[in-house]
Regions:
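Non-transmembrane, amphipathic alpha-helical segments
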Residues: 14, 18-32, 51-62, 85-95, ...
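Hydrophobic faces of stable alpha-helices that mediate helix-helix packing
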Residues: 30, 34-37, 143, 147-154, ...
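Long amphipathic all-alpha helical oligomerization modules
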Residues: 162-186
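Long, charged all-alpha helical bundle/coiled-coil segments in cytosolic proteins
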Residues: 56-132
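Leu/Val/Ala/Ile-rich N-terminal alpha-helices, chiefly Sec-type signal peptides and the beginnings
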Residues: 1-78
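Residues that form generic nucleotide/phosphate-binding pockets
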Residues: 11, 15, 106, 179
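A structural signal for well-ordered alpha-helices, especially hydrophobic packing surfaces
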Residues: 37, 41-44, 67, 71-74, ...
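Intrinsic, low-complexity N-terminal interaction/targeting segments
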Residues: 3-10, 101, 107-148, 159, ...
Length: 186
């Protein structure tokens, strides 16, 4: 029995169509996640206004109140990714996840002036820490998000001086110095 090339290749076409559909579903969820991230970033921008230094905690609480949406988006993503296929598709959400980590780190820094742990970030966004446990926060994404925090803190230090808060830049400098030392050990 002979099968034609078109019959053989039609099975591949079905596979390619299914993968295209899955990637499109993932893109839709990631697009919604990106929109939520923009909303949260916008809610945190007033920290740079000189008159708002006393309101850091309220901005953080407002931003945290929107994290349930982030958790829902990651839950949707997790449900769409086939078992053991995380790294096949993670290029879709890698950069937005780095921004989410940065926002988590900024919020924790503003509230407590300390570095957020990978476990805390995973808990805040509703994912796992370890790959073996399922949809997780990749170590590289965590580290890149933390690096992005330094840019925002540099901006915050300059704005703090403008607002007359001369101790904040010193604390930020010490924190970034400790962060730098930690990254040098990696």
């Amino acid at each position: 029995m002979t099968t034609s090339a078109s019959e053989i290749l039609s099975h591949f076409q079905e596979y390619l169509n299914a993968e295209h559909d899955l990637r499109e579903e993932i893109r839709i969820v990631v697009r919604d996640l990106e929109q939520t991230v923009r909303e949260i970033q916008t809610s945190l921008q007033p920290i740079h206004q000189p008159a708002q230094t006393a309101n850091y905690l309220s901005f953080c609480e407002n931003a945290l109140s929107m994290f349930h949406k982030i958790q829902e988006h990651y839950k949707q993503l997790s449900s769409k990714i086939p078992l053991n296929q995380y790294y096949r598709f993670n290029d879709h959400w890698r950069f937005v996840t780095q921004r989410v980590v940065y926002m988590c780190a900024l919020i924790i820094y503003l509230k407590e002036e300390r570095l957020v742990s990978r476990e805390e970030v995973a808990d805040m966004i509703g994912v796992q820490v370890n790959r073996e446990d399922g949809f997780h926060i990749d170590l590289d994404d965590y580290l890149m998000g933390i690096l992005n925090l330094t840019n925002e803190l540099s901006r915050l230090a300059m704005n703090a001086v403008t607002a007359g808060d001369y101790s904040r830049p010193l604390r930020i400098s010490q924190f970034i110095g400790e962060l730098d030392a930690g990254f040098r050990e990696l």
